Regions:
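Extended, small/polar residue-biased N-terminal targeting/export presequences
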Residues: 55-116, 161-165, 169-193, 510-521, ...
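Polar, glycine-rich mid-to-C-terminal structural blocks
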Residues: 298, 310, 317, 321-388
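Cleft-lining beta-strand/loop regions that shape enzyme active-site pockets
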Residues: 29-42, 46, 50, 54, ...
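Conserved functional hotspot residues or short segments at active or partner-binding sites
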Residues: 351-352, 356-530
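Hydrophobic membrane-insertion alpha-helices, especially the h-region
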Residues: 8-24
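Positively charged n-region of N-terminal signal peptides that target proteins for export
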Residues: 1-5
């Protein structure tokens, strides 16, 4: 059975490439008979053209690259979410969807010309070998990784169980240590955090939807139940989506048996329904779903399924607006196409897919329009189409046509400075500054107990000033320290926490100064008292 994906994901030779792509697709799926005689002639003609270029053109031509460009051009003219996966990308994409890969288990960035370890995966090969955040990897089996044109992580990849020796430079040392590491299966975590926000309210942060997400999410639910959770909040902010079934499994945790969660329609208008089962652990308890403008596809499936069944409360800002379903099909040479094969609809019958008539660039940059029209600050600025109005079984008004509008609106960061700092919180900028600190004067933190770090560690002024100076680079000259000091300190401490103790602690710390989390707690208390 082919997997279906809901994923938030660019004209050279369009004419002849169309024939090649269609020919490959139909051949892969055993549908060559669908071609008319004329179609077969065109396909052979186009394939012949590629052969002639390959054999007779005056210069050497990489016809594989021509085909790749052509296929990309074709798919760009279909919809924003139909994509081509080249043979070079195929393994990484497969790993991402599956939720694991073979490697040494590190998060890293290239610092100047050297691989610097941000953190190690818990119980992974590198952690077991004694590698820590702040370490720099200089060699693999004696071959240098540093220097011009030398930095490539390909040498770190290999088969599971194979062994390599890393040359590692630790903070404060001048000796390069030779550390043997055995490659292994590394889980790509979907659940960043699962902990109790209050005595009653459990919290789960989910960053993606992969094949492994269901098992991770179920474990998180079990942890919270054992800790006494009577309510649960699922944070899907900035979650771009992924595997459809994982989203349906998540929604099933909160919906009763036989409740419609979603339906799909293909090109022939054939309908496929997805219903909840009786397996949910929180069917009779309050649930909250957190979304924002970057919550897409599978995240929207969950939010839409619950909202249309009058289950729980959706908190945040209007979601991205993707209602297309992709199916991955192999093209026979290791490459694949992830093609839109259906539209999905929430239980009330609404499509939340945004229009894409103006092209892919405008489609993916639509958030700029949301910013300019004030939607991110005021719910009343959200444009709705009354012809796309629907009612839930309880009579609540919901809209199709572009994302899930939350039940409870929480404004985004206001003003340039707050938006810049929010961007820093969601990207790796602060991580790099913190990692440099760990390699130098902060190396002692690598041995500090987590409780001591949480309870008593304060970010030094020198680190704050270094972050501030680097943050003001580029287009951020107007960024001020006054009024932002407390959040900058928290952001740096959270980045250090992730590199030292794991992502969950980073999430916990950032949540202490998060307006949406504050509003969530208010709603939780109100629900408890009713």
């Amino acid at each position: 059975m082919k997997k279906q994906y809901l994923y938030y994901p660019l004209f050279l030779g369009i004419f002849f490439g169309l024939g090649i792509l269609i020919g490959n697709l139909l051949s892969v799926n055993g549908m060559d008979d669908a071609f008319t005689t004329s179609g077969n002639l065109k396909k052979r003609k186009l394939n012949r053209l590629i052969d002639i270029i390959d054999q007779r053109y005056v210069d050497e031509v990489n016809t594989d690259s021509i085909v790749d460009v052509t296929v990309n051009g074709i798919l760009q003219n279909l919809d924003p979410h139909s994509i081509y996966i080249s043979t070079d990308q195929a393994q990484a994409v497969a790993d991402d969807m599956r939720g694991n890969f073979v490697g040494i288990g590190i998060r890293y960035f290239v610092n100047e010309d050297t691989i610097s370890v941000l953190s190690t995966i818990k119980d992974g090969p590198s952690q077991k070998a004694g590698i820590k955040s702040g370490d720099r990897i200089l060699t693999v089996d004696g071959r240098p990784l540093y220097g011009e044109n030398k930095v490539s992580t390909d040498q770190l990849k290999g088969e599971s169980g194979s062994r390599i020796t890393l040359g590692v430079l630790k903070p404060g040392d001048s000796t390069v240590f030779k550390i043997p590491v055995t490659r292994g299966q590394i889980a790509i975590k979907s659940v960043d955090a699962a902990y109790m926000l209050t005595n009653e309210l459990g919290y789960i942060k989910v960053n993606r939807f992969a094949e492994s997400t269901t098992a991770e999410f179920n474990r998180a639910i079990d942890i919270l139940k054992r800790k006494g959770a009577q309510q649960v909040a699922v944070d899907l902010r900035d979650n771009p989506g992924g595997v459809l079934q994982a989203a349906l499994d998540m929604a099933d945790e909160f919906l009763k048996d036989d409740q419609l969660m979603l339906f799909q329609k293909d090109r022939n208008n054939k309908r496929k329904n997805s219903y909840a089962t009786s397996d949910g652990d929180f069917e009779d308890k309050p649930v909250f779903i957190l979304i924002n403008e970057n919550s897409a596809s599978a995240s929207e499936v969950v939010a839409g399924a619950l909202q249309d069944n009058d289950k729980g409360t959706i908190i945040g800002r209007r979601s991205f607006g993707k209602g297309l379903v992709q199916q991955e099909m192999q093209l026979g040479d290791g490459s694949a196409v992830r093609l839109t094969v259906a539209r999905y609809y929430t239980p009330t019958g609404r499509s939340i897919q945004r229009p894409y008539d103006s092209g892919n660039e405008d489609y993916f940059n639509e958030y700029l329009e949301r910013y300019e029209n004030g939607e991110l600050q005021d719910k009343s600025n959200i444009e709705v189409n009354d012809s796309l109005m629907y009612k839930t079984p309880a009579g609540k008004i919901v809209y199709g046509g572009g994302g899930i509008i939350p039940d409870v609106f929480v404004a985004g960061p206001k003003g340039y400075e707050n938006q810049t700092l929010d961007y820093f919180a969601r990207t790796g900028f602060a991580d790099r500054v913190a990692n440099d600190f760990l390699r130098t004067e902060g190396s002692y933190l690598r041995y500090m107990p987590e409780k001591e770090f949480v309870d008593s560690y304060q970010v030094p002024e020198t680190l704050l000033l270094e972050f501030y100076q680097r943050a003001r680079g580029g287009n951020n000259k107007s960024l001020r320290l006054t009024g932002n000091r407390e959040f900058m300190m928290l952001l740096l401490k959270a980045s250090l926490a992730e590199q030292l103790y794991g992502t969950e602690l980073k999430v916990k710390l950032l949540n202490t100064m998060d307006p949406m989390i504050d509003r969530l707690k208010e709603l939780s208390r109100d629900r408890k008292n009713t």
